[in-house]
């Protein structure tokens, strides 16, 4: 079971005007704006991977062929915000909505994001369960932690200042040391 990103539902945690000011670029240097606008989501994705946290809200879909035996389904989506939809999908792809009440978010949506399943769920009987959740900071979720916003700024600034200086390391997207330290301090640990 892998959560599928269905839709980005919010804005980037750092906008283009904020990054232009952070990089001390004047408003007449519009040639760089397109590059910076493309670097923002890339830097966010790199910081998200390092911190194991979602910095932008999104909607995800999970499809199950069986209800979890212990009534618990860990998800790699932190922070988990809400269960949006629950349904049963038959062989023809028709979705029958069910009350999402028996499916809820676990007690720690940051460090142990999971779904809890109540005992009163209908049997699947050859159908699949479809569950949509929202996850990520911003929007309806909690605010992005300030150290991760700074890590995003530092990452983007490092990439912007050192563009074209890869020294043969094609595809290197390593975080600058200061940004990596900030992301590590906020990292969600796994056992």
Regions found by a protein language model. Name each.
Residues 1-191:
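Divalent metal-cofactor coordination and adjacent catalytic microenvironments
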């Amino acid at each position: 079971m892998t959560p599928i990103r269905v839709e980005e539902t919010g804005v980037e945690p750092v906008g283009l005007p904020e990054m232009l000011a952070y990089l001390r670029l004047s408003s007449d240097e519009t040639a760089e704006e397109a590059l910076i606008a493309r670097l923002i989501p890339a830097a966010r994705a790199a910081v998200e991977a390092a911190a194991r946290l979602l910095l932008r809200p999104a909607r995800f879909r999970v499809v199950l062929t069986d209800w979890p035996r212990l009534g618990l389904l860990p998800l790699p989506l932190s922070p988990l915000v809400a269960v949006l939809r629950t349904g049963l999908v038959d062989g023809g792809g028709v979705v029958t909505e069910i009350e999402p009440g028996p499916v809820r978010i676990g007690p720690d949506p940051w460090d142990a994001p999971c779904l809890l399943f109540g005992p009163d769920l209908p049997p699947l009987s050859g159908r699949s369960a479809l569950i949509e959740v929202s996850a990520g900071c911003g929007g309806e979720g909690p605010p992005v932690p300030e150290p991760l916003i700074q890590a995003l700024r530092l990452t983007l600034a490092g990439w912007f200042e050192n563009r074209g200086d890869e020294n043969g390391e094609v595809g290197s997207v390593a975080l600058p040391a200061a940004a990596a330290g900030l992301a590590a301090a906020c990292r969600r640990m796994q056992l």
